[in-house]
UniProtKB/Swiss-Prot annotation:
It comes from Mus musculus. The gene is Taar7e. Glycans are attached at residues 34, 210. This is Trace amine-associated receptor 7e. Belongs to the G-protein coupled receptor 1 family. PROSITE patterns: G_PROTEIN_RECEP_F1_1, G_PROTEIN_RECEP_F1_2. Olfactory receptor specific for N,N-dimethylalkylamines trace amines. Trace amine compounds are enriched in animal body fluids and act on trace amine-associated receptors (TAARs) to elicit both intraspecific and interspecific innate behaviors. Ligand-binding causes a conformation change that triggers signaling via G(s)-class of G alpha proteins (GNAL or GNAS).
Length: 358
C-alpha cells in the first residue's frame, strides 16, 4: 500500500521540494511550467544503481509471479482450491510489479511524476488495492493451512473450491473497493484542504490522508496480521504434536490407514511451513512501513525522506519474494519453471505432466 509519493503519507520528497521552490538554482521537473515541482535526481552512479535495483525488483515480481500463475493454471496436478488461492495471491503481486513498481522507480530516482494526473490517482489506487489484496489472501491461506494441518483427512471436504472462490472474491472486492473509495471520494483529505492546495505542484503525485484514514488503514493491516500470527502459532503447536506422535508410532507396527494419515499430515505440514515463511517474509517487509506510517501521521511526518524510501521499497520487494520462496522449497515449482522456460508446456498433453515423482 505504499507508492512513495502517492502513498498514505505526504510525499516527503514533494514537501522538501516546496521548501526549495524559490531557489533559482534548483532543477525543476518541468522547466517551462509555473508551479513545477523541484527535481532532485541522483548523480549518474547512484542513479544507475537505483534503476538497476528497483527495475530488477519489478521484473522479478512480474516474471516470477507470472510463472506461479502459469504453473498452477496449466498443470492439472496443481488444480486444487488451495493452489488457486496461491495463484490469486501471485496475481496481486504480479499486478504490483506491472502497474506500480515501474512508475515508482522513475519517481524515486528522478524525484518527479511524469505520467499525468489521471494515472497518478490510478497508480495510487492500484497500489492500495493490490497490496491490500495480498494481505487478505495471505490471511485466508493461513486459515487454509490450519485446517489442512489440524485434520488433513477431512480437509478436502472443508476447504472446497466453493470456499476458495469465496475467499478470492472477498479479497479482491474488499481491497479494490477500499482502494478506489479512499482515493476518489476525497474523504481521506477531509480537514487537509489548505495543506493540499499549498503543496500542490506540477510533477508531483502526493496523497494526503488524515489521521482517521491512517488509523483505518493500519487496522486493515493489523487485524489480518494478528489472525495470521495466531493461526501459525497453532499450526506450529499441532505440527510439533504430530511429529511426537509419529515418533511414537514409528516404534510400533502401524496400520495402513495410520501410515497414510502420517504421509498426508507430513505433506500438509511442509506446505504450511513454506507458506508460513511467505507470511513471515510479508510481515518483515510491510510491518516497518505500516508502523512508520501510523506513527508519522500523528507526529507531523518527521520520517527522513531516505528512510521513507527504504521502507517503501522493502515493502515493494515483497511482491518479488514469494516466487523465490516457492522455487526454493517446492520441487514441483522448479520442474514447472523448467518446463515453462524451455517451451515444453506448449506440447500436447503437457498439462498432464507428473510434477510429483515418487
Amino acid at each position: 500500500m505504499a507508492t512513495g509519493d502517492d502513498s498514505f503519507l505526504w510525499d516527503q520528497d514533494s514537501i522538501l521540494s516546496r521548501d526549495l521552490f524559490s531557489a533559482t538554482s534548483a532543477e525543476l521537473c518541468y522547466e517551462n511550467l509555473n508551479r513545477s515541482c523541484v527535481r532532485s535526481p541522483y548523480s549518474p552512479g547512484p542513479r544507475l544503481i537505483l534503476y538497476a535495483v528497483f527495475g530488477f525488483g519489478a521484473v522479478l515480481a512480474v516474471c516470477g509471479n507470472l510463472l506461479v500463475m502459469t504453473s498452477i493454471l496449466h498443470f492439472r496436478q496443481l488444480h486444487s482450491p488451495a493452489n488457486f488461492l496461491v495463484a490469486s495471491l501471485a496475481c496481486a503481486d504480479f499486478l504490483v510489479g506491472l502497474t506500480v513498481m515501474p512508475f515508482s522507480t522513475v519517481r524515486s530516482v528522478e524525484g518527479c511524476w511524469y505520467f499525468g494526473e489521471i494515472y497518478c490517482k490510478l497508480h495510487t489506487c492500484f497500489d492500495v488495492s493490490f497490496c491490500s489484496s495480498s494481505i487478505f489472501h495471505l490471511c485466508f491461506i493461513s486459515v487454509d493451512r490450519y485446517i489442512a494441518v489440524s485434520d488433513p483427512l477431512i480437509y478436502p471436504t472443508r476447504f472446497t473450491a466453493s470456499v476458495s472462490n469465496k475467499c478470492i472474491t472477498f479479497s479482491w472486492l474488499l481491497s479494490i473497493s477500499y482502494g478506489f473509495s479512499l482515493i476518489y471520494t476525497g474523504a481521506s483529505e477531509a480537514g487537509l484542504e489548505d495543506l493540499v492546495s499549498a503543496l500542490t505542484c506540477v510533477g508531483g503525485c502526493q496523497l494526503a490522508v488524515n489521521q482517521s484514514w491512517v488509523f483505518i488503514n493500519f487496522l486493515l493491516f493489523l487485524i489480518p496480521t494478528l489472525v495470521m500470527i495466531t493461526v501459525y502459532s497453532k499450526i506450529f503447536l499441532i505440527a510439533k504434536q504430530q511429529a511426537q506422535n509419529i515418533e511414537k508410532m514409528s516404534k510400533q507396527t502401524a496400520r495402513a490407514s495410520d501410515s497414510y494419515k502420517d504421509r498426508v499430515a507430513k505433506r500438509e505440514r511442509k506446505a504450511a511451513k513454506t507458506l508460513g515463511i511467505a507470511v513471515a517474509a510479508f510481515l518483515l517487509s510491510w510491518l516497518p512501513y505500516f508502523i512508520d506510517s501510523f506513527i508519522d501521521a500523528f507526529l507531523g511526518f518527521i520520517t527522513p525522506t531516505y528512510v521513507y524510501e527504504i521502507l517503501v521499497w522493502i515493502a515493494y520487494y515483497n511482491s518479488a519474494m514469494n516466487p523465490l520462496i516457492y522455487a526454493f522449497f517446492y520441487p514441483w515449482f522448479r520442474k514447472a519453471i523448467k518446463l515453462t522456460v524451455t517451451g515444453k508446456i506448449l506440447r500436447e498433453n503437457s498439462s498432464t505432466t507428473n510434477l510429483f515423482p515418487e
